[in-house]
UniProtKB/Swiss-Prot annotation:
Molecular function per GO: mRNA binding; structural constituent of ribosome
Superkingdom of this protein's organism: Bacteria
Coiled-coil region: none
InterPro entries: Ribosomal_uL13, Ribosomal_uL13_bac-type, Ribosomal_uL13_sf
Keywords (A to Z) from UniProt: Ribonucleoprotein, Ribosomal protein
Keyword Flavoprotein: no
Quaternary structure, from the entry: Part of the 50S ribosomal subunit.
Known role: This protein is one of the early assembly proteins of the 50S ribosomal subunit, although it is not seen to bind rRNA by itself. It is important during the early stages of 50S assembly.
Protein name stated in the entry: Large ribosomal subunit protein uL13
Assigned protein family: Belongs to the universal ribosomal protein uL13 family.
Length: 154
């Protein structure tokens, strides 16, 4: 009896769609990151891109717990001396690219490296409810029903 090792040719990828409206960002990101890596499958192999293709819609309607909406800061550096920049979650969600909050939360839960970058290409995040992936016939994953803490109660 030897350890099962999946080969890239044996991978079966599914398409999953998740409605992020009212979901807590971190809890949504952990579920999506697990699906992207393929850790929810019995055939998980660490060095093979075994994850599913994930579509996240309504990313602009995600929820934060506590005061993170106004207090959480996202940092980046321009590359120039003294070029550290910051924005709050509120500024990003009300700005041009509100889906970036969800993308960054998921990206920071995926291992950094060539395989992680390939797995991140299987993620599509849209601010609104429209997406161009109807032809793939994605199955709906109801994250809100998995755990009551996944949804922010008002």
């Amino acid at each position: 009896m030897s350890t099962f090792v999946q080969k890239p040719a044996e991978v079966e990828k599914k398409w999953i769609i998740i409605d992020a409206e009212g979901l807590v960002v971190g809890r949504l990101a952990t579920i999506v990151a697990t699906r992207l890596r393929g850790k929810h499958k019995a055939t998980f192999t660490p060095h093979v891109d075994d994850g599913d293709n994930v579509i996240v819609i309504n990313a602009e309607k995600v929820a934060f717990t506590g005061k993170k909406y106004s207090d959480k800061k996202y940092y980046w550096h321009t590359g120039h001396p003294g070029g550290i920049k910051e924005r709050t979650a509120r500024q990003i969600i009300e700005g041009r690219f509100p889906e970036r909050v969800v993308e960054k939360a998921i990206e920071r839960m995926i291992p950094r490296g060539p395989l992680g970058r390939r797995q991140m290409k299987n993620l599509r995040v849209y601010a609104g409810s429209n997406h161009p992936h109807e032809a793939q016939q994605p199955t709906v994953l109801d994250v809100a029903a998995l755990n009551k803490k996944n949804v922010r109660s008002a």
